[in-house]
Amino acid sequence: MELRMKKVSVIAAAVAATLAAGSAFAVDFHGYMRAGVGVSADGGQQVTFEKQKIGRLGNEGDIYGEIQLGQEVYNNNGKTFYVDSMIAVTSNGSNDWEGTASNCGTTVSHPDGQDPSATTKCVDDAEFALRQFNVQAKGVLDFAPEATLWAGKRYYQRHDIHISDFYYWNISGAGAGVEGIEAGPGQLSFAWVRNDRNDNFKLGENNPGDTPDAGNDGGAANVNTLDLRYAGLPVWENGSLELGLNYALVNETDDASDAAKDAKDGVMFTAELTQGLDSGFNKTVFQYGTEGYSKTMAFYGDGSWYGAEANDGASGYRLINWGVIGMGQNWEMGHQLVYGVGEDMWDGQDKLETMSVVVRPMYKWDDNHKTIFEAGYAIDDNDGAENKFGKLTVAQAWSAGSSFWARPEIRVYASYLTADKDDNSNAFDGGRSDDTFQFGVQAEAWW
């Protein structure tokens, strides 16, 4: 009996040690996903059309996911080190097997094999991306033990509107910084992030927009973004202010093109007022940008890409209001209002104005069942040439809770999309129609 009890004690101790070790090395698992299936009344798969301007509900034809794994690897005397990582994947959901080698080098004329003249490397395949890989250290700065010192690649203090997937302040990328320094009533953060200019962007007949730099890794102009923010400044009851300044430094090499050498550094200023409400919140944002940041204001940019090819003296600004509020026991509504201006961005261009209105009211039948409506309308006016876009969506949804933000959620939807373009071109059905209907089912989750 005594021997048996000793064996039990040894086993219990081993199990306890294993559990303790598992707790010490527990990995934080977070993520996001959206996926589904949809068709267009014109034939073929559903489309994704101007969702930042007219809303994303019933207007996403892709599959997208993020897998985030992180772990605290050191904790001693108030000092911690955390390693974070994230892989993202996107595809159009056309097949069961979607990978980086799917249908590579094939064309319509060579559907079953390699086409030696093909310029497209892969068709209808999945794309994988390294989105985050960084180290975050807390308690290591003697002058600010509450702050976080970080380096690597990361999502950095992103600001977005969920109902349109519109990121209006987001310089994420590879970099380093210190965030969360207590300074008076708020917190101060500073970062340096690399945001090289993609030289494939083209806009304007007389200005191709390319800023190639053969001497830089990747062949595009090297842009370094310096970011300074002061957040959490109380202004009145339930109201707080965040202020930010971004400086884009174009760092060309001797082998850079003339366009890259002529590119000017730019400044983007952001002020965001957040108002807490009894049944939700509201945010009002003002942004102003010079030089390449003028295009950020005009084309729903977020600051992570810099329009280095913009004309010298270009400028722009943007006003945004968005939020989510409860309206009684069963109704909630999200909205966005956007007005942006870009001026003198390329030769012959004077003023581009963009306006967007999106509303998403939701009725909750019970804790897990809701009906969602979304309507969006947008106008782009470039020196009198107007493009108008619209969308109406109705969806029945089942979610893990009744909140506007409750996820996972499965939704069945029907959408009507329309486009009225200044050049009379058609946006749908391969250029044969100016409107379309689509129907589908989508799941969305974050954890």
Curated annotation (Swiss-Prot):
The record marks 167 as: Important in sugar transport. Its main location: membrane. It is a multi-pass membrane protein. The keyword Cell inner membrane does not apply. Keywords: Cell outer membrane, Ion transport, Membrane, Porin, Signal, Sugar transport, Transmembrane, Transmembrane beta strand, Transport. Induction: By maltose. It comes from the Bacteria. It is found in: Cell outer membrane. Residues 1-26 form the signal peptide. NCBIfam families: PRK09360.1. Involved in the transport of maltose and maltodextrins. This is Maltoporin. It comes from Vibrio campbellii (strain ATCC BAA-1116). The gene is lamB.
